[in-house]
């Protein structure tokens, strides 16, 4: 039975990972060892025997493990991973953070899409397996069946949910919502109140010096933020750059990349990403054939008919938050020509966007 270290299991991604491992009884298959960066010796977590928490910075403790799953973040990875490898550790490093994604000796894991790449890498002795960018993973879960077949992705318009920026940002969004509500709460309940007065108070509150923007820097509630991550010299944001870079690494196509680009915008959804996609097909393919390819790709993708009511009920963050379902809808040919396809997809960024791929990577290791 493999000794598996778990680090960062108290955070949001780590908590979802723990929940999924409990639901699927994964802990029955391993000897879990829980680590902490702040509470060494404290009460342990789940397992066959609860033991005190171990020091996540102790190279000697970490060296005793067959595999490590970390959701602790990029700073931890950057500090500990090279020291651990330099100390001669030959175990498997499974990481939800982005630090190692583009490393030559690492594989981005999304097994419903790139199981062949994962298996080939395991056979070749690769030991580093990294969860992908949440929007990229969710896009490929939705449309991965089209790769190498009739389509390529030319544009990706990402509406990014709030957890992507962190738990403190999620709390700030809720505070922003509450602040706006408090400023106008009396007026909506009064039928005699002037709607323009309500309309004036909302933006006035957003622009006030007291509006909580410590984490976002600008209002998000009742607004949007048209930029995510760092600014790059070519005009892209780093989040937009990841679309092509990580997609092609996941698919094993770095030398023959599929072009992927788009505009990434932050909106006030809590833990989901929504993506409007424009896909250029290699040839004119009937919509029915495309629907068949998408719906057969994996057990979690859900094809939503391109009708108003179905779209409103099934194709939104409110409908799928907390589920593994990845709905795809609004499929239709675009006015630019019969080789252009429009689509819209939504996914939970804490499940398929973060925790589930690393959980499933552990199971792949356990199969060997």
UniProtKB/Swiss-Prot annotation:
Q: Which InterPro entries match?
A: Asp-semialdehyde_DH_CS, Asp_ADH_gamma-type, Asp_semialdehyde_DH, NAD(P)-bd_dom_sf, Semialdehyde_DH_NAD-bd, Semialdhyde_DH_dimer_dom
Q: Give the residues annotated as active site.
A: 134 (acyl-thioester intermediate), 273 (proton acceptor)
Catalytic activity field: L-aspartate 4-semialdehyde + phosphate + NADP(+) = 4-phospho-L-aspartate + NADPH + H(+)
- Which keywords are on file for this protein? Amino-acid biosynthesis, Diaminopimelate biosynthesis, Lysine biosynthesis, Methionine biosynthesis, NADP, Oxidoreductase, Threonine biosynthesis
Concerning Gene3D superfamilies, the annotation shows: Dihydrodipicolinate Reductase, domain 2 (3.30.360.10), NAD(P)-binding Rossmann-like Domain (3.40.50.720)
The entry's substrate-binding residues are 239, 266
GO biological process terms, alphabetically, are: 'de novo' L-methionine biosynthetic process; diaminopimelate biosynthetic process; isoleucine biosynthetic process; lysine biosynthetic process via diaminopimelate; threonine biosynthetic process
Q: Where does phosphate bind?
A: 101, 242
Pathway noted in the entry: Amino-acid biosynthesis; L-lysine biosynthesis via DAP pathway; (S)-tetrahydrodipicolinate from L-aspartate: step 2/4; Amino-acid biosynthesis; L-methionine biosynthesis via de novo pathway; L-homoserine from L-aspartate: step 2/3; Amino-acid biosynthesis; L-threonine biosynthesis; L-threonine from L-aspartate: step 2/5
Give the residues the record marks as binding NADP(+).
10-13, 37-38, 72, 160-161, 191, 349
Under the GO molecular function aspect, what terms does this record hold?
A: aspartate-semialdehyde dehydrogenase activity; NAD binding; NADP binding; protein dimerization activity
Q: What broad class of enzyme is this?
A: oxidoreductase
Residue span of the signal peptide, if any? none
Its EC number(s): 1.2.1.11
Whom does it interact with, and what assembly results? Homodimer.
Q: Which family does it belong to?
A: Belongs to the aspartate-semialdehyde dehydrogenase family.
Biological role stated in the UniProt entry: Catalyzes the NADPH-dependent formation of L-aspartate-semialdehyde (L-ASA) by the reductive dephosphorylation of L-aspartyl-4-phosphate.
Supply the NCBIfam families for this chain: asd_gamma (TIGR01745), PRK06598.1 (NF005144)
Give the protein's recorded name.
Answer: Aspartate-semialdehyde dehydrogenase
Organism, by scientific name, is Azotobacter vinelandii
Q: Which gene encodes it?
A: asd
């Amino acid at each position: 039975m493999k000794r598996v270290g778990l680090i960062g299991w108290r955070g949001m991604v780590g908590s979802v990972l723990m929940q999924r491992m409990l639901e699927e009884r994964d802990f029955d298959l391993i000897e879990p060892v829980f680590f902490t960066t702040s509470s060494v010796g404290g009460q342990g977590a789940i397992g066959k025997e609860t033991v005190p928490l171990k020091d996540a910075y102790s190279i000697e403790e970490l060296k005793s493990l067959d595999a490590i799953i970390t959701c602790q973040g990029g700073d931890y990875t950057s500090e500990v991973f090279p020291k651990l490898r330099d100390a001669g550790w030959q175990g498997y490093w499974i990481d939800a953070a982005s630090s190692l994604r583009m490393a030559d000796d690492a594989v981005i894991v999304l097994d419903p899409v790139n199981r062949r790449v994962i298996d080939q890498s395991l056979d070749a002795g690769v030991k580093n397996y990294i969860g992908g960018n949440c929007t990229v993973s969710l896009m490929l879960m939705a449309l991965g069946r089209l790769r190498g077949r009739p389509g390529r992705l030319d544009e990706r318009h990402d509406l990014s949910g709030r957890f992507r920026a962190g738990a403190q940002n999620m709390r700030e969004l809720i505070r922003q919502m509450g602040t706006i509500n408090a400023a106008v709460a009396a007026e909506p309940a009064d039928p005699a109140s002037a709607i323009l007065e309500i309309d004036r108070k909302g933006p006035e509150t957003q622009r006030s010096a007291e509006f909580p923007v410590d984490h976002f820097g600008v209002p998000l509630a009742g607004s949007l933020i048209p930029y995510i991550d760092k600014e790059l010299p070519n005009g892209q944001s780093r989040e937009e750059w990841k679309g092509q870079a990580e997609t092609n690494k996941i698919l094993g196509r770095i030398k023959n990349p599929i072009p992927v680009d788009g505009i990434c915008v932050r909106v006030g959804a809590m833990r989901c990403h929504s993506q409007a996609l424009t896909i250029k097909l290699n040839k004119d393919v009937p919509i029915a054939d495309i629907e068949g390819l998408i719906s057969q790709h994996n057990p979690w993708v859900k094809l939503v008919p391109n009708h108003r009511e179905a779209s409103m009920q099934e194709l939104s963050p409110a409908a799928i938050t907390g589920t593994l379902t990845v709905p795809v809808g609004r499929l239709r040919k675009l006015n630019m020509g019969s080789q252009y396809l429009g689509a819209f997809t939504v996914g939970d960024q804490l499940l398929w966007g973060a925790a589930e791929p690393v959980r499933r990577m552990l199971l792949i290791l356990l199969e060997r």
